[in-house]
Amino acid sequence: MTEYCFPRHVRLLNAGDYQSVFNDTSSKVFAGEFLLLARKRDDDQTRLGLIVSKKTDKRAVGRNRIKRLVRDSFRHHKIPLSGLDIVFLARHGIKELENADLHNRLDKAWDQLAKKALKPTQNKKRDQSRQK
C-alpha cells in the first residue's frame, strides 16, 4: 500500500528542481490539454512536479481536481517511469475534460513518456552539430 503514496521524496519541491527539467528536457509528450516534460536522473528515483495555473481554471476546486487526478494516475505508473524528473503542465481546456477522460489520456501519456525515455537521446548530438 505504501508504494502508492506521494511523499516529499517523489515530488519536485523547489524552483531549482523545476528549472532543471525545463533546461535539460530529455522527453516531451504533448496531449492537447497538457504537456509532460521529463529529464533523466542519475538514480532510479522518479519525481513529479505539477503546474496548474489560474489561466487553466480560475477556481481552486478545479485546479485541485486536476492535480488530484494527475497524482493518482502517477502513483500507478511510477515503476515504468523510474529515473525521471517529470513536470506536468496543464494547458487551456483541461478543465472541460471529465475525470475518466483525463485519466485515460494520462495513462496513454505516461506510456508514451516511458517509451521515449527508454530511447537513447540523440537530440543533444544534433543540436551540437547545428551550432558548429
Swiss-Prot record:
Q: Which family does it belong to?
A: Belongs to the RnpA family.
* GO BP: any one term: tRNA 5'-leader removal
Question: What species does this protein belong to?
Answer: Marinomonas sp. (strain MWYL1)
Subunit composition and interactions: Consists of a catalytic RNA component (M1 or rnpB) and a protein subunit.
Task: Quote the SUPFAM superfamilies the UniProt record gives.
Answer: Ribosomal protein S5 domain 2-like
Enzyme Commission designation: 3.1.26.5
Supply the alphabetized keyword list. Answer: Endonuclease, Hydrolase, Nuclease, RNA-binding, tRNA processing
Indicate yes or no for the key word Nuclease. Answer: yes
Q: A Gene Ontology CC term for this entry?
A: ribonuclease P complex
* Protein role: RNaseP catalyzes the removal of the 5'-leader sequence from pre-tRNA to produce the mature 5'-terminus. It can also cleave other RNA substrates such as 4.5S RNA. The protein component plays an auxiliary but essential role in vivo by binding to the 5'-leader sequence and broadening the substrate specificity of the ribozyme.
Q: What is the name listed in the Swiss-Prot or TrEMBL entry for this protein? A: Ribonuclease P protein component
Q: Which GO terms describe its molecular function?
A: 3'-tRNA processing endoribonuclease activity; ribonuclease P activity; tRNA binding
The cross-references to Pfam families, in alphabetical order and at most eight, read: Ribonuclease_P
